[in-house]
Every structure is written in C-alpha cells, then in structure tokens.
C-alpha cells in the first residue's frame, strides 16, 4: 500500500567573456547555484494508533489505501478526530515474528495498539502455548510503553478440529481477562455473518468492502479509549 521524489537541478549559466577584456585574462568558471535545501519534515503531533498485525491488517490482495487501517484513518479524519493510524501489518507474520519486531512498534510511542496476530500461527497448527506466550510478551511490551492494547481475536476453519479451535480462541479470551484489555472476539465476525462477498476468493482475506466493515468494527471497539484520551 510510493511516489517518486522529484529533485530540482539548477543549470549553470555560462559566463560570456567581455570583448574588452585584457589579453590572457583568465575567465572565471561558472558555478552552479546551490540547490534549495528542503525543510526537515515536521513531526506529526497527533497521538498514534498502531495496528500491529499480519496480512489482514496489511491489506493482502487489495489496492493501496484499501486496508482496514486506511479505512480507520478516513473515518477519523471525517469526524475531525486528530489521530494518526500507523499500519504495521506484515503479510505472513506469526506471533514469533511479531515479538522480533516489537521494538520498532514501541518506538512510535503509540497511545493505542490494535494487536492483530495469531491467525498464521493457527493456520500452521503451531502449539497454542507458544502463541499464547508470544502474545503475552507483546502485550506486556506495549503496556510497559504506555499503550492501551486492543486484542483482535481470530478463529480457524472447522477442519482444524474442535479441540484445537477451542484452545486457540481461548488464548484471546484469557489474555484479555488477564490484562484487562478491550477484546474483539473475532475481528472478521461481521464479514462472515453478513455476506461472503466481503471475503476474497481465498476464503481468508477481506475485500475492500470487507476492510471497511472491519474498520468500523475496530473504531466501535476503541471508542471509549478515544474518548478517554481526548479528556487528558
């Protein structure tokens, strides 16, 4: 979900020699005028909502600007709410890979974090205990950095078996209770219950319309956090 930068080069002007110049008088070479120096970018003063996730956040299969974090930003802007949504979704990421890049996320000093990881762990049949431990570590890191964490839960297709699915879903429930987090039990619930046209042909990822629905789901869940932050 880059534009090419354009640089301005100033062409040097040739200095003409004067007809009345003394013989053998050296002619000063033309020097190009210095290129203008761009102003340093100003830091965005808005508080950050970091969406720390996988391909669901990254907008897999969608055009630039169609991911659900993009949709969140549009809704917030339309409501004149001064928040900056930063999309930190990476397609294919597991919770282990999330742990490995946690420092880059906490360095943004987010006020709110939407933690949307674990789905790839489940789809790969990874041990539930390791997924739980990784999510636990990330939650602690974000909370220690001063962020309010919103946990976005996922589920799995029926062929993974009822026991594994139950234990997988329980990860999110248990961690939300342990750390007093806002929990979205199943991030894509509104998509699968409304119309399957909101899911791409792979049966996993949301369409552009589906991403807009997810954006609304997340914004509804974090509304109390947005209001609390505005009162500070």
Residue ranges and their predicted role:
Residues 1-18:
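Sec-dependent bacterial lipoprotein signal peptides
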Residues 28-91, 101-109:
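Serine-esterase "nucleophile elbow" of acetyl-processing enzymes
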Residues 6, 62, 91, 128, ...:
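A generic secondary-structure micro-motif detector
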Residues 97-232:
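Alpha-helical cap/lid subdomain in secreted, periplasmic
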Residues 20-24:
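Bacterial signal peptide processing site
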Residues 92-96:
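Acidic-and-aromatic substrate-binding clefts and catalytic sites of carbohydrate-active enzymes
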Residues 15, 44, 78-80, 144, ...:
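Short, well-ordered coil/turn elements that cap or connect secondary structure elements
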Residues 16, 84-86, 150:
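Conserved Rossmann-like nucleotide-binding pocket used by diverse enzymes
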